[in-house]
Regions:
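Helix-boundary/low-complexity linker signature
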Residues: 1-159
Length: 159
């Protein structure tokens, strides 16, 4: 069965989720092109992390978003690297009122050249980029949470 036929056979909710993922990936790609100083304020609390706990309904939605991004980033007509995928996941989760943490890391490739990576976590679920995250040292985090949750984020850090 062709890709289009498979897509058309999906139920309406899945189609909308996949279209949303493509739009979010496009937006994430644009965000990568912008100066980071312009993007950073929209990413959340700098050097903070959201809690690892999530309720079952949120976890279900997070897994759906993760699967949609993992599937659709391979089918965009442009390359979607780790940072754009993380931005896309953050955007999709924010639309659902679900908090997340963006991790930025650095490491070295096999030739000793400096490389960077980004990944996204929500609750105890890694949404994007977890396949190679253990090869990088975290240099920055951004906790995307609502202003009323700042106290919970700070308590999580102390805990």
């Amino acid at each position: 069965m062709g890709k289009l036929k498979k897509f058309l056979a999906l139920n309406r909710a899945k189609k909308l989720l996949l279209v949303e993922a493509v739009v979010a990936l496009a937006k994430g790609r644009v965000m990568v092109w912008l100066p980071f100083s312009k993007v950073a304020p929209s990413l959340g609390f700098h050097m903070k992390e959201t809690p690892l706990a999530a309720n079952a309904e949120e976890a279900r939605k997070v897994r759906q978003v993760a699967r949609a991004i993992a599937l659709m980033h391979r089918h965009t007509p442009w390359q979607t690297h780790c940072l754009a995928r993380a931005f896309a996941g953050m955007n999709m989760l924010q639309r659902r009122g679900i908090e997340s943490t963006l991790y930025l890391g650095t490491g070295k490739d096999e030739n000793g050249k400096m490389i960077a990576h980004a990944w996204l976590r929500s609750g105890d679920i890694y949404v994007t980029g977890d396949d190679v995250m253990d090869q990088f040292t975290v240099v920055a985090t951004y906790a995307k949470a609502w202003k009323t949750q700042e106290e919970e984020i700070v308590q999580h850090e102390k805990g």
